[in-house]
Each structure stands twice: as C-alpha cells, then as structure tokens.
C-alpha cells in the first residue's frame, strides 16, 4: 500500500471468499475544521464526528454525482445535526444546541429525544431522493443500520466513533450472490464477519491504522485493501450565492432590509462563519443584472 496522502480518507476492502465489501474512514483535519467554527460541547462534537464519518462512508457506497445531505433533528438539547458531503468528497457540517441542557455524559437519547434522521441525495442530474428513519438506536451507528434495514434488502452495518480529535468509521455491506450462492452460507458468512467487526473497540478504531484494524479483525480471512480516497473540508458558500439569496427576496424587500440594518446587510454562513456584506450599491448592482462584483468578495 502507498503512503497515505492525508489524514482524511476512505479506503475500501473486499473479502475474496465472501460476498461482502467494507469501507473504513479516517477524519482529522476536516473534523477539526468543522469543530473550529463553533464552541461545541464534547457530546455534540462526538455526534458531529460520527455523522461526518457516516457521510463519508455513504458517499462511497451510494454511487452518484452531486450532494449527500444528512440531517438529524429533534426537540431536545440538540435540535439539529447536519453534514453535507459531495461526490467530490468535500465535506462540511454544523450543529445547533443548547449548551446549558447538555451533560458531559449525555447519550444520543438525552441529546436528541424523539429525533429523526433524514438522508438526502441531491444529484447533479436527476431526481432528488430523501429517506427518513427514527433516531431509535442507542447510537448513530445503530440508527444508520436501521435505516438500511428499512430501506433496502442489502445487509449493511455501521460502526462510528469520534472523540473530538479524530472521527473513524467502518461499514460492511453484502454484495449480490456470486461467491456464495447458497442462502444459508451467505447468511452464516455475513453473521460471522459482522460479529467479528463488533469486537472492535472505539479505542482500537480511533488509534490504529487500517491495515492493523483489518488484521486484528480478519487475520483468518482473505481480505483485499484498495487505494485510499482523500476527503477534505470545503464550504460551498460564496458571495455570489448570498447575492442570489437577496435577489430571490425581490428588489423592494432587499432595499428595505438595507435600510432596516443601517445601510448594509450582513449574511453569515452557518457552516464556516464567513460573512458577506451588501450595501445599497451592491443591491442596485444585483438587480441591474450585473451580478456580484468579484473584487468585493474580500469584504467581510
């Protein structure tokens, strides 16, 4: 295997004697970028890391060109977790929370009671798809496993861990019958491989490299590990997009906002905290059809 290109990547593997594939994800730099944007309490930071790991694994599983959006919503101390990951493996995320209601040892059920998990695939070309499942697992990994149980026949299992410094994940998924045609053999192989994966501890997945993880779990299996696929943090916000949002309000409302806000409107990106400032001259330019003045992108 070649040297790893970065701290953030996914890596696929397959079992030569079973109709099962797997994927591992490691996130450090992009995870740190997301956490640096807001002072997240530790339990919230852990959930964000787990959701980032899940999104990274899913982008490699759901073959499409476009954007994957994961949203967990609830009526509890964490009303929203949101991760976006593109097919180009660019990822960003955020959470909304009430810090005063979050205990250091809070569980998923404590943080997001009566919650739902929505998975949205927004392809560049084609129809948008969304699936929703209750947040009824003891952790996010169980919730994603439940989602796949409800939405498709293919067996899929997740293991997700994060500690505020790194986020890791493991996915196992059944493939169409090829090597094992007998259904009982397929079921037995699947149960065997997932049972071994369930022996993996959070400390092991968070601290060990992929080759060591796979050796510890499957040293008696024939496993092939493929090249890594890098990921990175990148926010898709821009001055142009912010300007388009103002145009959608209409000229009169946009001008009124400028007046109400003392001569300029400040639009903040919730993902990266970037700020875009628009004054009366900018509004006039937008509605004159000239678009956004590129040099003013530097104004925050």
From Swiss-Prot:
InterPro entries: Heat_shock_Hsp33, Heat_shock_Hsp33_C, Heat_shock_Hsp33_N, Hsp33_helix_hairpin_bin_dom_sf. GO terms for biological process: protein refolding. It holds the Pfam family HSP33. Under oxidizing conditions two disulfide bonds are formed involving the reactive cysteines. Under reducing conditions zinc is bound to the reactive cysteines and the protein is inactive. Disulfide bonds join 235-237, 269-272. It comes from the Bacteria. One of its GO terms (cellular component) is cytoplasm. It is found in: Cytoplasm. SUPFAM superfamilies: Hsp33 domain (SSF64397), HSP33 redox switch-like (SSF118352). Keywords: Chaperone, Cytoplasm, Disulfide bond, Redox-active center, Zinc. GO terms for molecular function: protein folding chaperone; unfolded protein binding. HAMAP family: HslO. Redox regulated molecular chaperone. Protects both thermally unfolding and oxidatively damaged proteins from irreversible aggregation. Plays an important role in the bacterial defense system toward oxidative stress. Belongs to the HSP33 family. This is 33 kDa chaperonin. It comes from Pseudomonas fluorescens (strain ATCC BAA-477 / NRRL B-23932 / Pf-5). The gene is hslO.
